Design a protein with these regions (language model features):
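PLP-dependent enzyme catalytic core of the Aspartate aminotransferase-like
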Residues: 450-451, 472, 481-532
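Conserved N-terminal alpha-helix of the aminotransferase class I/II PLP-enzyme fold
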Residues: 110-148, 398, 403
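N-terminal secretory signal peptides
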Residues: 1-31
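Active-site C-terminal subdomain of aminotransferase-like
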Residues: 282-284, 292-397
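Active-site phosphate-binding strand-loop segment of PLP-dependent enzymes
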Residues: 201-255, 259, 280
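Conserved PLP-anchoring active-site segment centered on the Schiff-base-forming lysine
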Residues: 138-139, 154-180, 189
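Conserved PLP-binding catalytic core of the aspartate aminotransferase-like
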Residues: 391, 399-406, 410-473, 480-482, ...
Length: 532
């Protein structure tokens, strides 16, 4: 046993605690090093702000390591946040780049002067953005938001009484409302998967829990990813492949995916997808993406697509060549009725719910009347910016920064405080910019079991922390009420009266290491800190 010359022998418990602290500090150094590699640091020792960075990129003195990070994200100059505001709630809504905002205003001014000047042009817009999401312009609709897209999906699929839909216990309100209407109006049976949290989580566990809900009556699955409560990115492709293997319709609420990660919808294999344009893609409000799989060709192809909105209905149009990836889902196309369109059945497209892979179904679904062209054009402009910057580079930036945040959290409150297992390098579940953690539960345990009274107290403390961060530190995050796994039995989730109230932080491309450190410093002033 180790000893100290003044204090005598050090207990095994203290030695273990010291080892855990050392391990946590190493995780922070590793996460920082991984992030700095994005800027080319680490090849040879450099000096930043008086701090020496070793050849492997690790800072020698963690206490002053913040000096090693760039003062701002390389993308930050494109955005116009209020001075001193640290906005970290992109999961609720994002912020459009300054140029996009300027062009948005200009478009509205032009429309005021010439009201019909921007009445059409959506086909060109869809041609522009579809490749960035790994799909055909014939399949991608610029919707009003994720909720709008989800409703147009579930109301267009001809569900019958007794059909079953598998969903999860952590859906956003849009998904909950959608399956509830199916239940109450059409007699659909809703079967719910309780999702695991913290060290109870694994992709295989998620797949097993979905499989346990499968019956002969199952018609569809509807799930969100990443989960807005926990930030966990579910195994989207594996779930869609499982659904296809069992001849089920797959519906994905991907509200947070556009703009956060590389999104290849053909590779994901979903039948339907709805995502937000105003969150991580940083478009204006009331914008989103609706995808409806309309083919099953497994090979990558070059397709010719028109530039006129009315080409599908016989109007002559110039065409452009667009590369699209092959489909991993080669199942027959499910029956689908367009529930919101001016031109149902035009040119035979989607008449009686019949599908034809050669049809431009997006043209029918897009024509719903006079939408906001400035909003649509602004959304396309943000997509152009993301494509130019590189969606892969953006995902790597976001994930690396989120991993650094998780390392700081694990260093202080322990890895048990996080919603998902903390592993480096980031596993698929962690390839997201959403981080959920709970510094309020007993032992800072995300899966701690709470009485209704303790749950209520935690909710008050969590809400107070969010409020104080905003009022005293100009930092915006949010909290949630989460049905977490139980520590005593991870196969069971907390009852509604005993939900926990963790904090949720969004790290995006305009944030930096300094921003994360600023958040951590503020958190230490307003939430519990371990007594080492």
């Amino acid at each position: 046993m180790r000893s100290h010359p003044k204090s005598g022998p050090i207990s095994e418990q203290v030695i273990k605690a010291i080892a855990e602290v050392d391990e946590a500090t190493e995780r922070v150094s590793t996460a920082r090093r991984d992030f700095l590699k994005l800027f080319g640091y680490g090849a040879a020792g450099v000096m930043l702000g008086g701090l020496s960075i070793d050849r492997d990129g690790a800072p020698r003195l963690f206490s002053t390591a913040a000096a090693a990070s760039p003062e701002k994200s390389p993308y930050a100059k494109e955005f116009g946040f209020s001075k001193d505001l640290l906005y970290m709630n992109i999961g609720t809504t994002g912020s459009s780049p300054t140029k996009v905002v300027t062009d948005f205003y200009a478009d509205y001014a032009d429309i005021a002067q010439s009201p019909t000047a921007y009445f059409f042009g959506q086909q060109v817009m869809r041609n522009t953005i579809a490749p960035g999401f790994g799909c055909d312009p014939y399949e991608l609709v610029m919707s009003f938001n994720t909720t709008d897209g989800l409703w147009r999906i579930v109301m267009g699929v001809p569900f019958q009484p007794g059909d079953e839909v598998i969903t999860t216990n952590m859906e956003e309100d849009a998904g909950i409302s959608a399956v509830s209407i199916l239940r109450d109006r059409f007699g659909v049976v809703v079967r719910t998967v309780d999702l695991p949290t913290n060290d109870a989580y694994s992709d295989q566990e998620v797949l097993d829990r979905f499989a346990a809900q499968l019956t002969a009556g199952t018609k569809a699955i509807l799930f969100s990813s990443p989960i807005y409560l926990t930030g966990a990115r579910l195994p989207e492709k594996a779930l869609c492949q499982w659904a296809a293997f069992n001849n089920l319709i797959s519906i994905v609420d991907g509200a947070h995916l556009p703009g956060m990660v590389v999104l290849d919808l053909h590779d994901m294999g979903c039948d339907f997808f709805s995502g937000a344009g105003h969150k991580w893609q940083c478009g204006p409000g009331q914008t989103g993406f609706l995808y409806i799989r309309n083919n099953f060709h497994p090979e990558d192809r070059i397709v010719e697509r028109p530039t006129s909105d009315f080409a599908p209905f016989g109007v002559p149009s110039e065409a452009v060549s667009i590369p699209i990836p092959g489909y991993t889902n080669t199942n027959p196309l499910p029956t689908y009725y367009p529930t919101n369109t001016l031109i149902y059945g035009a040119a035979g497209i989607l008449a009686n719910g019949v599908r034809n892979p050669e049809h431009n179904i997006a043209a029918v679904l897009q024509l719903v009347g006079n939408g906001s062209r400035p909003s649509q054009r602004a959304l396309v402009e943000t997509c152009d910016m993301w494509d130019a910057w590189g969606r892969g580079a953006i995902e790597d930036y976001i994930v690396s920064l989120a991993q650094y945040l998780r390392a700081r959290i694990a260093e202080i409150w322990g890895p048990q405080s996080l919603s998902i297992p903390y592993v480096t390098p980031a596993q698929p579940v962690a390839r997201t910019g959403l981080t959920s953690f709970n510094p309020f539960s007993p032992a800072f345990d995300y899966n701690a079991e709470l009485s209704p009274e303790a749950s209520s107290q935690q909710r008050s403390a969590s809400s107070a922390a969010v409020s104080t961060l905003m009022s005293d530190y100009s930092i915006v995050i949010r909290n949630n009420s989460v049905p977490h796994s139980l520590r005593s039995d991870p196969t069971q989730n907390a009852a509604p009266g005993s939900f926990s109230s963790p904090l949720r932080v969004s790290t995006h491309l305009f944030h930096s290491l300094d921003d994360v450190d600023r958040l951590i410093e503020a958190l230490l002033a307003v939430v519990p800190y371990p007594a080492w």
